[in-house]
Amino acid sequence: MAAALVLVTGQGAAAVPLRVDQAAFRDIYRELVETDTSAPAGSCTLAAERMLARLKGAGFGASQAEVFVPEGRPKEGGLIARIDGSDPSAKAMLLVDHIDVVAARREDWPRDPFRLVEENGYFIGRGVIDDKALSAIWIDSLIRMKKEGFWPKRTIKVALTCGEESGEAVNGVDWLLQHRRDAVEAGFALNEGGYGITDANGKPVALYLAVGEKHSQSFTIEARNPGGHSSRPRPDNAIYDLADALTAIRRFSFPIRLNATNRGYFTRMAPIVGGDMGQAMAALGKGSTDGAVVAKVTSDVTYNAMLRTTCVATMVEAGHAINALPQRAKATIQCRLFPGEKVEGVEAQLRKAIGNPAIALSRDGGKGEAVAVPPPLDPAIVGPAEEVARKQFPGIPVVPNLLTAGTDGRYLSAVGIPTYGVPGIFLDPDGNGAHGVNERIRVKSVYEGRDYLYALIKRYAGR
């Protein structure tokens, strides 16, 4: 077999030659992207079965890899696999990722969203960044280890699951914890959420290691009124009462919370950001709560979200007829809770901020999701990430990052499995179109991230 394969782009121009192992990875990646796993049209089970076939072809037996399917959910299956370690006393490590994706309508895309296209240095397709690149890397890593005869000291487990993107689906990680705890029990887990950041020219700036994430909780606030004919306005009005409540929430800010993760983030990013903002970040990293410092840092919406619980109005519904006074008006408030914060406490603060007992406030239903528990900023996790980065990305710092969104890691952390979002794949400043049309990721970044993560897995696993 030739030492390298030449890949041809969708436009017919020759791309950078691939190593044989890279070509094998690309085929796994292609198969995942080209398997529609969106709800309700697609099937995570089919994707899991295809990955199982890959593992079987590499020599994994029935006791080492299998597909699981939650009862009554035939399309919401996933995959569990493992390579047993040589040291029974060493706690296992878990590589977890979701294989479901956000729906993509063919009419909105200039090309089939469920076809992997390589164009102008980018992979394009639904899920190329969220999150099938990482899923492909996990499967590819197991196959590479099998071929190399690599026998880790600690057991390596993999779980590819469904239900992260859709609230209607069974969450695969939650299901495994309830029904197959043995498959995911581990000393720690590596997950999505970490990434590399670049500047406007695509130059790498930092590697974000996600250490903690926020928990999502929605509330409904509602104002009611007897209503009446619109020709006879009354001083009390459900819409006005709701508007007052929304204004109160808008003006309210939850207190800032400092922990090891966000302090580490601001400390390491301060010299990179520079200027007045960098100075304020450095002060915050040292624990300062000076009003001017906090005001400067929180003027950036991302930094603000890393420092406190946030609540924002996302939907409004009011009135029933254009010629009638409204009998009810309601709004949805979406909150992102700082790690470790209790829903009850947030609810109480919202009630106090609204200050009107006539406004009803209720928690929206859901699947009883676990409150995010912050994992420790463990040197045994951070150290190897920095060590491998120095070899692969010299001069690029590893920065602990508090993820302001949420992942399936919240389920694992809640039951005592510290979960970290690993970096390696660099993103563009614009977010790469995740969840949108023409989702894309730099080809070079995917291959570099694959190499980084493979080395990192082996470093954590030991021999």
Language-model region placement:
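Acidic/His- and Gly-rich active-site-bordering loop/insert found
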Residues: 16-128, 135, 139, 145-154, ...
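Sec/Tat signal peptide C-region and signal peptidase I cleavage site
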Residues: 11-15
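Acidic/histidine-rich catalytic neighborhood of metal-dependent amide-processing enzymes
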Residues: 122-123, 129-208
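Short, solvent-exposed loop/turn and secondary-structure capping segments
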Residues: 44, 92, 104-108, 168-173, ...
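Solvent-exposed loop/turn segments at secondary-structure junctions
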Residues: 38-40, 72-74, 86-88, 99-103, ...
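Solvent-exposed, acidic/flexible segments
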Residues: 18-26, 37-48, 74, 128-131, ...
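Bacterial N-terminal signal peptides
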Residues: 1-10
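Metal-dependent amide/peptide-bond hydrolase catalytic core
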Residues: 54, 195-205, 209-448, 460-463
